[in-house]
Amino acid sequence: MSNRLHEELDIRCVKAPASIATATATKSDYVDGSGVDEIAFLWSMATLASGKTMTIKIYAADDATGTNATVVATGTVTAGADAIAKATGCASVKVPGDGKRYYCAEITHDSGSGVICSCVAIARPFYSPAVEPALVVSA
């Protein structure tokens, strides 16, 4: 029997909804990547005006405060001729296991005015097979 999707994923709000000014880089909280193979950051934006862009960068760092953070992935969403109501941008990164273990996502946009944005981080923990019970005998 399989779990329901929400039971298989670790989903965290890493940036509460807030107005983000145009051309202002805003980072989410850092999440610990140990025990997961991939982390996806899902940014939601109230509206992305026609021809405007949302850019998402993912940073890897040595600790949860962002020490020695470096950009490991970048993606852009651009609205076409029509504005995108309820715009969503998703970027993900594979966690190498031998590098930095803390990750965050940064968003910037060029909408011309403040836009309400929020972010969730989604990860699926590594599969760990059940451990066979051990028989302990003591004299």
Model-derived regions, located:
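Surface-exposed, low-hydrophobicity beta-strand/loop segments enriched in small/polar/acidic residues
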Residues: M1-A139
